[in-house]
């Protein structure tokens, strides 16, 4: 079938809006019509050429919502007409990782997904007879996309796709990191480095967890109003100080902050976040994705004296079994999604959405098909 899509033909180049061919779903696969998709920093990271798994030409996009059109052989968990959110972190329930109960990092389709391919090692997309790669198992920058059954969360059909599509990545990643990775407790102190969608979601999650002091940190003070709305008690611009941000936080509590979250992908900030964590028990959670080849460092004494350095992917959330409940929470108002959507655009305007993001003028732009 034909589908309009925003295709990245080469790194560092604007996306091109073209009509592509989408093949029917094969065994264990599902064809969906995407209704809405967010434009995320991870899409921009891959488009920049810095992503070690980046392959081109590719249909980007991984933060979407849509409706099932057709199912392949053996698919039982969804049917045509079901409303779904594609998942870049699958949940098969059968691999060693799923069975462990310790992680959400399912490996059922990981090997092929990282190569831009479907589980059978081929692609369902083509343009002028030439194959196009998939992206993170989702490719939501196409009006129609094919996704593995294990990479789909079935959601309430009454949910507002313009809002809940954000649960496909950014908001879930931030809120989940608070509850699942850090396990923030009532009264704990929290510092959030970077107030994009993920960082703001961490702030909201910290408020849900009844954290005592929630410190929001960004060099763009325009982000502070929304951070306060989501629950920040303090907003700090590092540019307002003539000393490292670590020292600013240690002035707040000389022993450090109970939980720090790095939501940028800057290895220097990752170190500052760790070294701002509380001596004896502080945790620092890395959420931001650093560029290819970059490494983190600190003095071992930081860890010897009780700090813990952790990472979080998709907030530790198991997509098929847990994400539908988060959609219900959003519908009840327990998760506030609307403020994240600062702009809505058509697919033809998608390059403008990337520009807004790079200029710091948007939190999330949602593309409506």
Swiss-Prot record:
Its cofactor is Zn(2+). Its main location: cytoplasm. GO terms for cellular component: cytosol. Keywords: Cytoplasm, Metal-binding, NAD, Oxidoreductase, Zinc. GO terms for biological process: formaldehyde catabolic process. SUPFAM superfamilies: GroES-like (SSF50129), NAD(P)-binding Rossmann-fold domains (SSF51735). Gene3D superfamilies: Medium-chain alcohol dehydrogenases, catalytic domain, NAD(P)-binding Rossmann-like Domain. It is an enzyme of class 1 (oxidoreductase). Signal peptide: none annotated. InterPro entries: ADH-like_C, ADH-like_N, ADH_3, ADH_Zn_CS, GroES-like_sf, NAD(P)-bd_dom_sf, PKS_ER. Binds 2 Zn(2+) ions per subunit. Zn(2+) 2 binds at residues 92, 95, 98, 106. One of its GO terms (molecular function) is zinc ion binding. It catalyses: S-(hydroxymethyl)glutathione + NADP(+) = S-formylglutathione + NADPH + H(+); S-(hydroxymethyl)glutathione + NAD(+) = S-formylglutathione + NADH + H(+); a primary alcohol + NAD(+) = an aldehyde + NADH + H(+); a secondary alcohol + NAD(+) = a ketone + NADH + H(+). Has high formaldehyde dehydrogenase activity in the presence of glutathione and catalyzes the oxidation of normal alcohols in a reaction that is not GSH-dependent. In addition, hemithiolacetals other than those formed from GSH, including omega-thiol fatty acids, also are substrates. Also acts as a S-nitroso-glutathione reductase by catalyzing the NADH-dependent reduction of S-nitrosoglutathione. Belongs to the zinc-containing alcohol dehydrogenase family. Class-III subfamily. NCBIfam families: adh_III_F_hyde. This is S-(hydroxymethyl)glutathione dehydrogenase. The lineage of its organism: Bacteria, Pseudomonadati, Pseudomonadota, Gammaproteobacteria, Enterobacterales. The gene is frmA.
């Amino acid at each position: 079938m034909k589908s309009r899509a925003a295709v990245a033909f080469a790194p560092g180049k604007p996306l091109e809006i073209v009509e592509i061919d989408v093949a029917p779903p094969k065994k264990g696969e599902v064809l969906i019509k995407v209704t809405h998709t967010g434009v995320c920093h991870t899409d921009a990271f891959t488009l920049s050429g810095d992503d070690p798994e980046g392959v081109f030409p590719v249909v980007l996009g991984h933060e979407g919502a849509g409706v099932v059109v057709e199912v392949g052989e053996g698919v039982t968990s969804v049917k045509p007409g079901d409303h779904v959110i594609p998942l870049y972190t699958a949940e098969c329930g059968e691999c060693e990782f799923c069975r462990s109960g310790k992680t959400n990092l399912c490996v059922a389709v990981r090997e092929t997904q990282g190569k831009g391919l479907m589980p059978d090692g081929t692609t369902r997309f083509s343009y002028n007879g030439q194959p196009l790669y998939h992206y993170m198992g989702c490719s939501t920058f196409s009006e129609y996309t094919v996704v593995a059954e294990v990479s789909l969360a079935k959601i309430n059909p009454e949910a507002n796709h313009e809002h809940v599509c954000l649960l496909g990545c950014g908001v879930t990643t931030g809120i989940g990191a608070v509850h699942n990775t850090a396990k923030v407790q009532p009264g704990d102190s929290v510092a959030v480095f970077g107030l994009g969608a993920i960082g703001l979601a961490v702030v909201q999650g910290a408020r849900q967890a009844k954290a005592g002091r929630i410190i929001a940190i960004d060099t763009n003070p325009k982000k502070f109003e929304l951070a306060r709305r989501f629950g920040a008690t303090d907003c700090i611009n590092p540019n307002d100080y003539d000393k490292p941000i670590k020292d600013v936080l240690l002035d707040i509590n000389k022993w450090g902050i109970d939980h720090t979250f790095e939501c940028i992908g800057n290895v220097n900030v990752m170190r500052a976040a760790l070294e701002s964590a509380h001596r004896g028990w502080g945790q620092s959670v890395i959420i931001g994705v650093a560029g290819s080849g970059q490494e983190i460092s600190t003095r071992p004494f930081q860890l010897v004296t009780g700090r813990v350095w952790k990472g979080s992917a998709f907030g530790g959330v198991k997509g098929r079994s847990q994400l539908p409940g988060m959609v219900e929470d959003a519908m009840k108002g327990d998760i506030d999604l609307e403020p994240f959507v600062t702009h809505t655009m058509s697919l033809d305007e998608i390059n403008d959405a990337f520009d807004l993001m790079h200029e710091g003028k948007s939190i999330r732009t949602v593309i409506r098909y």
